[in-house]
Amino acid sequence: MSDLKITKGTLNLPSAAVRLIGDHPLQITASSNRHLLLEVTGQKGDLQMAGRLGDIAIVDLLSFFNMFRKSGALHCALSGGDKTLFFQNGEIVFATSTFAEEEIGETLYGLGMLDREVLQGARQFASGVMTLGKALIDQGVVTSKDLWAATRSQVETIVFNLFAFQEGSFAFFDTRLEEDQVLSLSMNTQNLIMEGLRRVDERAVYMQKVKSLDAIPVATGKVPNDLDSTSQRMLALVQRGVADARELLRRSGAGEFDTLRLLSQLIERGVVAMEEAPTVKVEGVLGE
């Protein structure tokens, strides 16, 4: 980020900041001879804390809010998108994300609850008039129970994926959620932290075997007698043929992390091999 200077009492902000703030009035929340913290006035929830990720790790932030039983919203501005985690008495109860792959429709698709054409149709049907979830329920594509389970999976994925970021900025506001927005997650915040850290480490190990989500899983013909039922279903999907590992992750319905783990185990045992995706020759002259 380029340096900012106050010239004749005027501070010129970067265009990106101006687009975010708009014409809302600002107030100085904190200042010293080394920093100046400005806050938009008249918004819901007061700013309690702000800083840069990297100087403060995600795990330390989440542990702090959990230890001191904080309630509010932690907004993280990251490379490629934003995430907001909502706390109630120190526990994460909801989360939102602007990352496309963490949208509820993509979560439902990733869990194998609908296909791409149905998802696109539901998005057009919703078209700003209603939420995508309500549109899918109204169309009979999913049940309320399906949507609740997918939303819980979505929130946990948003949290788990947050641990992969080492840079960005954060701000914590004392914004409260409405009661009907509060989710009961499958694990408390401390367990989410431990699981998130574990997944970052283990996913890197699994990907060493899988190599790429664009690679094609192929059955080798070897079928051990001691495969559990989940591994057998995974192998059956591979035997029927999938375009690539990414499609296998979606069709398994087990979620990305667990599917990568199972696929990695099948590769390690020689049951599945990964082949490079074939290259496609494009005819013609570039630019035509």
Which residues make up each language-model segment?
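Acidic, Ser/Thr/Pro-enriched low-complexity segments and adjacent helix/loop capping patches
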Residues: M1-E288
